[in-house]
Structures are given as structure tokens and as C-alpha cells.
UniProtKB/Swiss-Prot annotation:
Gene3D superfamilies: 2-Layer Sandwich (3.30.810.10), Phosphatidylinositol Phosphate Kinase II Beta (3.30.800.10). Coiled coil: none annotated. Residues 1-23 are annotated as: Disordered. The gene is PIP5K1B. This is Phosphatidylinositol 4-phosphate 5-kinase type-1 beta. Transmembrane segments: none annotated. It is found in: Cytoplasm, Cytosol; Cell membrane; Endomembrane system. Residues 25-395 form the PIPK domain.
């Protein structure tokens, strides 16, 4: 039988045997949780709503539930136990803030048996999830529960200012006392939905010291990998559109500063990656439908509970990376370096660790043996900075240009048309050079040709100019035909010049694929190869 000691150590037992935590079976713990929460939340509904006061954060209510029952409590087949509720009015406010009604809260936790999860970390805690996937119930140590109590006033203030956060959302703190043993539990939001298979799950701290999943962890059906595993598997990171990346990093930065202000460290980002694949989706769609049928009440939805809502809110879908119509189930659309379409589910976990004396000592001796900047235990400010840097540079990356903006498209079209115009001008110059060579052989000078055609002497002190960016941009918007025409006035002058020797064509037409460029001789911009060549203007 698997067991967990007072210090959180897990003792391996035979397969299929029920786990125990502090000498109490998991079934007894689950039953006590459901009975205790059912009584306290139901009793709380009779109390009138009012503003939360400072003393409300330190209130502890207690009720005794004997196995034979009492005037206030039902009979049950578990050992006698006492159930404590910490700050009931404050947590009622938190639940209301996230849109959780008392009936929905009771339905999720008490209507169906709680589902026990395999331990995803090394904390030795037991994890239960409600049948509708809304809530996670986790056992915590005495110091963690005590720290959460002290954290509540600041936590209350932060949630009031910003309910959209990746920090854990605490909905209740309770304690089961039985046989002289205290089992403290906390109810939180569920970060990873069971309805979707997580192809990869990572626990990321931004540290490299011993941050690789153990062999035992890798043998699990759903292993949780660590930082070094991520750098090996996803060495190019995960890619988001610009808006989603900005919202995600702003949320992480704000959350880290909140944790730093409370001197909290050693937290992690729990990251679940679901690879979107048509074959996988079809199979998972059937299984998730079977798993959820009849177990979730219509209309219940915890506000700000999904990863996408936590960073952006319901008004922004951020689905430019995943272009096809997909039910994201609250996941954040992203792409891998291989171009795979992904849904990401994430949340910051394990925040009930303050930088106390033991942590300072732990970092000190680790820093003597290893690089102090690589170990996970560090002072809160440095830990937050390293965590953010790792997330921004190694994990989450921005797709540079999923969709070209109008200004970029205009610049690209101008560049392409300029290059095309250079080729056209070169061809026209070569043709006119041949024509002029014929004129020279018949005795007509270039200087007179320049005077008649251009109406002025050549100016060696003038440097040929190229179109300005403003001219090019304005000309690009006037493109409407698909041919190149030589100005009629210039043709008329040429006809008069060459009437005695050689007749010029009435027009010269050059076909482009997408655009047209008009060349005239009255505006000087581009010069041909010869010093005496005519000066041309390029209009887009």
C-alpha cells in the first residue's frame, strides 16, 4: 500500500492498493472532504452578504461530524472527524468573483465521487479532481496552509485589481482532523483539463540544476518533464501571434512581480501541450464526450478559469496561429518549430513557498557546489527575473509575420516594382541607343538631339535623382493597367526628328504580370548608361 508520511514522503506499495496519507486512506479523505464542504457551504448560504472585513481573513469555523450523525450533520461510514473551514466569508467572496455559485460549487465537489490523480510532482501531496474537471483538491503541509492564511489579504487585493491571472485561484482552505492527525486541503482551479490528452506536460522553473525528469517519472503513463527536457524536445520554443505573445508575457510579468512582493519563490509554470491532429481529435472527441456526458451541469462556467481567459479575456480569441475552426477549450493556440498546431494550457503552481531561513541555507550550500544562478532555490527578485527571461527567450516566442500589414505590403510592392522598372528602363535604353546610333551615322549630332527633345542643354552639374519614398508610395497606389506606354508627346517629337531617315513606332508596349509603369521624358529621374543618354522618369 502506498503511503505518505507526515513530512510528505511517499512510500511505494503494491499495485492497485489504495493510497494512504498520514495513515488515512484516500477514500476516507475524499468522503470527509465531500461531507465537510457540503455542510459548511450549505450553512454559509444562510449568512447575509456583506463586505469582507480584515478580521474575516483570520476566522476559523469548526464542526464535528460523528459517524452516527447528529442534529446538524448526517451519518456516515467513515471514522469520526472534525472539519475546519478557514476564512469562509473571504473565500465565499473569491468564489463569487469567479462566478461560482454555491449550488454549482457543491454540485462539482459533492455530486460525484472525486477522482484521484497520480502525483505529478515530488511534494508527496494527494491530488483529486472533480468529475466535471472544474476543481483540483490538493493536500498541503502545515507551513503551506499557514502561509496561505497570511497571504489572503494581499491575495484579495490582487484579485480585486486583476482577476485575469495565471496565479492559482484558491476557492477554499479546509482541514480534516481525525485520530489526532490534521489533513489540510486547498481547493483550486484545474489547469489541465482531462477532456483533452496532454501530449506533453512540463514543470518549468527557469533553472537547469537537476531539472530533468527522473527515470521513474518517465515510466509513468503521463510523465511531467522539466526544464532540460523542454530544451531538448522543444529547442526552438513555442510560437504565438504577436497579440497573444504580448498578452501572455505581460500577464507573467505582472504575476511574478506580485509573487516577488510577497517574497514567494520556487514556483513553477505547469505547461500542458495538446498537439492538434485530426485523427487524434476524432478519437479524443469521442472519449471526452463519454467522460463529460451527464457530469457537468448546463451553464456552469468558472470565470477566468482557462489559460486564454487568464491572459486576454473573452473578447480576444488570439486564434491567428490556429486558422481552422477549432474548439480550443480555453487553450492558447500556438505552433511548434515543426509547424505543428498546438493548444497550450498553463498556470503558475507551487506558490506557497516563501524565502525563509531554510531556503536561504539551501541556496547557500548549493551555490558553494554549483553555479548559484542555475539552482532553483534563489532570492525572490532574482528568481522572478530568471523565470521571466527563460519564458521569454527559451519557451514563448513571437511569430514575426503571420500576416503582412498594409504598410509592409506597400513597401514590398514598391521594392518589387522598382526592381522591375530598372529592368524595363535598361531594355528601353538599349533600344533607344540603337536608334540613336542610326541617327549618328546619318550625320545628326547628339547635342542637337538633346536640344530638341529635352528643350535645354545638358547640365553636367546636375546629378540624376531617384524617386523619393513619398513619390514611390503615391505612385504605387495609382497602378491600374498592365502595359507600358511611351508618352505621345515624346513620340511626336521623335517622329519629326526621324522622318527623313527612320520611322519610330507609334508606341512601345511592355507587359508586366501585375502592374504597369509609365515612362515620360518630361521629368528627369533615371539616367541610362551613356553620358549622353536621355533622362527618364519612372511612375508606378
Amino acid at each position: 500500500m502506498s503511503s505518505v508520511t507526515e513530512n510528505g514522503d511517499v512510500t511505494a506499495g503494491k499495485p492497485n492498493e489504495e493510497k494512504t496519507y498520514k495513515k488515512t486512506t484516500s477514500s476516507a479523505i475524499k468522503g470527509a472532504i465531500q461531507l465537510g464542504i457540503g455542510y459548511t457551504v450549505g450553512n454559509l448560504t444562510s449568512k447575509p452578504d456583506r463586505d469582507v472585513l480584515m478580521q474575516d481573513f483570520y476566522v476559523v469555523e469548526s464542526v464535528f461530524l460523528p459517524s452516527e450523525g447528529s442534529n446538524l450533520t448526517p451519518a456516515h461510514h467513515y471514522p469520526d472527524f472534525r472539519f475546519k473551514t478557514y476564512a469562509p466569508l473571504a473565500f465565499r467572496y473569491f468564489r463569487e468573483l469567479f462566478g461560482i455559485k454555491p449550488d454549482d460549487y457543491l454540485y462539482s465537489i459533492c455530486s460525484e465521487p472525486l477522482i484521484e490523480l497520480s502525483n505529478p510532482g515530488a511534494s508527496g501531496s494527494l491530488f483529486f479532481v472533480t468529475s466535471d474537471d472544474e476543481f483540483i483538491i490538493k493536500t498541503v503541509q502545515h507551513k503551506e496552509a499557514e502561509f496561505l492564511q497570511k497571504l489572503l489579504p494581499g491575495y484579495y487585493m490582487n484579485l480585486n485589481q486583476n482577476p485575469r491571472t495565471l496565479l492559482p485561484k484558491f476557492y477554499g482552505l479546509y482541514c480534516v482532523q481525525s485520530g489526532g492527525i490534521n489533513i489540510r486541503i486547498v481547493v483550486m482551479n484545474n489547469v489541465l483539463p482531462r477532456a483533452l490528452k496532454m501530449n506533453f506536460t512540463y514543470d518549468l522553473k527557469g533553472s537547469t540544476y537537476k531539472r530533468r525528469a527522473s527515470r521513474k517519472e518517465r515510466e509513468k503513463s503521463n510523465p511531467t518533464f522539466k526544464d532540460l527536457d523542454f530544451l531538448q524536445d522543444m529547442h526552438e520554443g513555442l510560437y504565438f501571434d504577436s497579440e497573444t505573445h504580448s498578452a501572455l508575457m505581460k500577464t507573467l510579468q505582472r504575476d511574478c512581480r506580485v509573487l516577488e512582493s510577497f517574497k514567494i519563490m520556487d514556483y513553477s509554470l505547469l505547461l500542458g501541450i495538446h498537439v492538434l491532429n485530426s485523427n487524434v481529435r476524432e478519437k479524443e472527441g469521442e472519449s471526452s464526450q463519454n467522460a463529460s456526458d451527464g457530469k457537468r451541469p448546463g451553464g456552469q462556467k468558472v470565470l477566468y478559469s482557462t489559460a486564454m481567459e487568464s491572459i486576454q479575456g473573452p473578447g480576444k480569441s488570439g486564434d491567428s496561429v490556429v486558422t481552422e475552426t477549432t474548439n480550443t477549450m480555453g487553450g492558447i493556440p500556438a505552433k511548434s518549430h515543426k509547424g505543428e498546431k498546438l493548444l497550450l494550457f498553463m498556470g503558475i503552481i507551487d506558490i506557497l513557498q516563501s524565502y525563509r531561513l531554510m531556503k536561504k541555507l539551501e541556496h547557500s550550500w548549493k551555490a558553494l557546489v554549483y553555479d548559484g544562478d542555475t539552482v532553483s532555490v534563489h532570492r525572490p527578485s532574482f528568481y522572478a527575473d530568471r523565470f521571466l527571461k527563460f519564458m521569454n527567450t527559451r519557451v514563448f516566442k513571437k511569430v514575426q509575420a503571420l500576416r503582412s500589414s498594409p504598410s509592409k505590403k506597400r513597401c514590398n510592392s514598391i521594392t518589387a516594382l522598382k526592381a522591375t522598372s530598372q529592368e524595363i528602363v535598361s531594355a528601353v535604353s538599349q533600344e533607344w541607343k540603337d536608334e540613336k546610333h542610326s541617327i549618328i551615322t546619318e550625320g545628326q549630332s547628339y547635342s542637337s538631339l538633346d536640344e530638341e527633345v529635352l528643350g535645354s542643354r545638358r547640365r553636367p552639374d546636375l546629378v540624376p535623382s531617384t524617386p523619393s519614398l513619398f513619390e514611390a508610395a503615391s505612385l504605387a497606389t495609382t497602378v491600374s493597367s498592365s502595359s507600358l506606354n511611351v508618352d505621345e508627346r515624346y513620340q511626336r517629337d521623335q517622329t519629326m526628328l526621324y522622318s527623313s531617315s527612320k520611322e519610330l513606332p507609334s508606341s512601345s508596349t511592355f507587359t508586366l504580370e501585375d502592374s504597369a509603369i509609365y515612362l515620360t521624358s518630361e521629368q528627369s529621374t533615371l539616367e541610362t548608361e551613356n553620358d549622353n543618354a536621355s533622362v527618364l522618369d519612372v511612375y508606378l
